[in-house]
Each structure stands twice: as C-alpha cells, then as structure tokens.
Amino acid sequence: MTKIYMDVCCWNRPFDDQMQARVHLEAEAVLAVVSEIERGDCQLLHSEVVDLEIANTPALELRQRLQILIPRQHRYIRCDQKISDRALVLEQRGFAGIDALHLACAESAGADVFLTTDDRLQRLAARHEHFLRVRVANPLTWMQDRLTN
C-alpha cells in the first residue's frame, strides 16, 4: 500500500480561491487522494507537525474545515530526537524549518511520497532528491501518474 504524507499546503488547497485553473485542479487532486485513503487504497501518514500547523491557523472556520477534511484513519507520527536531528540537517540544505520537520516526519515513517503544492519546496526537493529519503511531488502530477500507470 502506498504511504502518503501531505503537508498543510496540500490540505489547504481545497479551501483556496478556486478561480485559477491550477488551484482548482490541485484541489480536485487532493480530494481524489483523500478518497483513495478513505477507500483503503493508500495509507495516510499524519504528524503532530501537521496538527500544530493547523492549530496555528488563525481563521477558525478554515481550521475546523481542515480538521474535518483529514481522514481519521491514518498512521500518526510524533516528533522525536531522530526527526528533530534530521530536520536540522535538512535546514542546513536550505529547507525552511516547518518544511524540514514535515520532510523528516515523512522520511521517518517510510513515506513513498510527500505531497505539496508549494512550488519553492518542490524545486528545492528536486535539487536535493539524491539526499532526500522520500519523493516530493505535486498532488496533481502524482495523481495523473498514478492514474496512467
């Protein structure tokens, strides 16, 4: 079973302004991934980093929507010293603190893919793909690949 880690950019996508075609398509891809998780076709890896980031979302309504969207059946990753140490190494490679923590959580749990809609993070991950222990992809691109293979 494919193990998927999704950052908060991904989880937010269905609630972003859908007027841009790209945003709309990425939102549909995120919802398709959620459907696959709910059907048991994929396993969601969820972390306390995601929970913390969502808890710090200033808009109460958005925070509540995010909490409802995330499937309840998931494997939960708690941060430990190993994850913190790996995140520090990733920060030294240029990853932002929260992104480094997300990546370290995904790696620690053996994720097959780390999904994000953050272009900057995707570009940086592509430059360091030999160093990362998880594939980083856009949910739309990943879903298209999954459907054609």
Features from the language model and the residues they span:
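PIN/NYN-family metal-dependent endoribonuclease catalytic core
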Residues: 5-58, 71, 76, 139-145
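Short, basic, glycine/proline-bearing loop/turn elements
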Residues: 15-19, 82-91
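Acidic, PIN/NYN-like endoribonuclease modules and their adjacent C-terminal/linker elements
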Residues: 2-3, 17-27, 36, 92-93, ...
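Alpha-helix capping/helix-boundary segments
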Residues: 10, 50, 83, 101-102, ...
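Short, aromatic/basic amphipathic alpha-helical patches
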Residues: 60-66, 124-129
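Acidic, metal-coordinating catalytic cores used for nucleic-acid/nucleotide bond scission
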Residues: 52-56, 95, 119-121
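Short beta-strand scaffold positions
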Residues: 78, 97-100, 116
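Helix-adjacent hinge/juxtasegments
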Residues: 63-88
